[in-house]
């Protein structure tokens, strides 16, 4: 009788695991969760994309936005997250100049100058990446923007204006690539 109960329990457990949804998105073999919880705020996946640079695969990305927020408000003061998984090694010191260039393309000069201390702090947090490493930026209103590498927090930069500027690199009016922005926004 015990054996029959064990078999029945095993069958129920196995049936339950096969019925569970996968809750993820995959692009180029890289898997991203369909949601993320940050400071008790649920962020939903809006889209995933592949960024090519000079014809080479640079990285894949996923963008998460606070549930209930409009996709047109991605740069507003709302919780959001971007994850980028790299296909190539990049030196930490090389992230700063690229970040400066892309922020400057998306904000006016007075705004860039006002944000310079936050941008410099952000750029100082970057470390070398190798293929398979994943950077994330998570913005929580009132808290700031956290940069993490492979899930390990590197630092927190305060300010909704900084968050809008740094997320504009991928989602602003002059992003890294329009096609990548559109993929991240599910368009």
Identify the meaning behind each predicted range.
Residues 20-187:
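Terminal leader/tail segments of proteins
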């Amino acid at each position: 009788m015990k054996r029959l109960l064990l078999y029945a329990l095993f069958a129920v457990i196995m049936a339950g695991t096969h019925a569970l949804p996968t809750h993820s998105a995959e692009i180029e073999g890289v898997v991203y969760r369909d949601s993320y919880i940050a400071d008790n705020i649920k962020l939903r996946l809006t889209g995933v994309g592949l960024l090519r640079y000079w014809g080479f695969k640079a990285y894949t990305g996923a963008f998460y936005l606070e549930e209930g927020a409009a996709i047109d408000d991605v740069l507003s003061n709302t919780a959001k997250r971007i994850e980028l998984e790299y296909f190539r090694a990049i030196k930490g010191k090389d992230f700063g100049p690229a970040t400066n260039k892309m922020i400057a393309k998306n904000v006016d000069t007075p705004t860039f100058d006002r944000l310079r201390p936050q941008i410099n702090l952000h750029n100082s947090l970057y470390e070398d990446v190798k293929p398979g490493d994943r950077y994330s930026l998570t913005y929580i209103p009132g808290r700031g923007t956290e940069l993490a590498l492979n899930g390990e927090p590197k630092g927190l930069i305060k300010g909704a204006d900084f968050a809008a500027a740094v997320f504009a690199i991928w989602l602003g009016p002059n992003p890294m690539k329009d096609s990548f922005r559109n993929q991240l926004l599910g368009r």
